[in-house]
Amino acid sequence: MSKKITIVDTTLRDGMSSVSHQFTPQNVADIARGLDKAGVPTIEVAHGIGLGASSIQYGFAAATDPDYVRAAVDAVENADIAALYVPGIATLAELQQAIDAGIKTVRVAVHCTEADCGQQPVEWAKEHGLTVMTFLMMSHKLDPQPLAEQAAKLDSYGADVVYVVDSAGAMVPRHAGERVAALRQAITADIGFHAHNNLGVGIANALTAAENGATFIDGSLRGLGASAGNAQTEVLAAAFERAGWDTGVDLFPLIDTAEHVVAPLMKEPQIVDETALVLGYAGVYSTFFHPTKRAAKKFGVPARDILMELGRRGVIGGQEDMIIDVASELAGRTYETPAPAGV
């Protein structure tokens, strides 16, 4: 009897980062419809950084989160629509708007050392009838046992699934397996794994995570996602089937959606370029990818030098302002406060 694995697709959330958050509601509907026909049970939809993130800081989306959610909900027959909630970016009011638009699942994402930041949204979401998946972002930054202790907190708040999240694409299979195995000993909730492909091992990490107890695996069509992108949904489906797992997903409709719906919308192929590779090697959060490239060009400093220094400083998501500081320092420049007018 085949072992069961649940594939969650994040093309319409993490994949938004690959198109500067410019999928239209019609694009969302077309992609969601294809995923639903292929049997994908949960489809994540929102701005690339999550609910409430459309801003000058993270980039303005082509539509509102409720518009995206409604487009997906109206397009599917069976799949649940999910949204990402990051405390400090999203608000409960915005989560309520997403509920009103039709989400059935919320994914609450916290830094791997800050599980307590997820207590309020997790408990609120459970009270409002949602399935709750939780993310321990930048999971490579904690050893397995401390990570499991953080996971236990999320489990105690009522999370249905706790994810090991390789936000930087910094893990190799051993790292993924050890962390999932530690969680399996510490919590009763299901375990998920979210890969990024910066070191080229996203699929291998996902397979190893499953072998060690993960039952939910994230992917995105054509690998769309921040920096090097995510584990590729259609490849995940094929690889898991070859490895003897039951995904419940129909491979060829999935491939068709990737090939004929998603690929024409891509600005460029999703590849592991120099910046993406060094970002994973340095263990830097994936959202630093584009801002680092811009800073490198502005200050005439190699992007890899900026990323290696950011990695040495241990920056995390939300500290993107450090990119300019580091680039300026490396270029031998400093910013001065402009003198008041007329002085």
From Swiss-Prot:
It catalyses: (S)-4-hydroxy-2-oxopentanoate = acetaldehyde + pyruvate. It is an enzyme of class 4 (lyase). Pfam families: DmpG_comm, HMGL-like. One of its GO terms (molecular function) is 2-isopropylmalate synthase activity. SUPFAM superfamilies: Aldolase, post-HMGL domain-like. Its EC number is 4.1.3.39. The keyword Metal-binding applies. Belongs to the 4-hydroxy-2-oxovalerate aldolase family. Residues 5-255 form the Pyruvate carboxyltransferase domain. Substrate binds at residues 13-14, 167, 194, 285. Transmembrane segments: none annotated. Mn(2+) binds at residues 14, 194, 196. The record marks 13 as: Transition state stabilizer. It comes from Rhodococcus jostii (strain RHA1). It comes from the Bacteria. Keywords: Aromatic hydrocarbons catabolism, Lyase, Manganese, Metal-binding. The keyword Thylakoid does not apply. One of its GO terms (biological process) is L-leucine biosynthetic process. This is 4-hydroxy-2-oxovalerate aldolase 2.
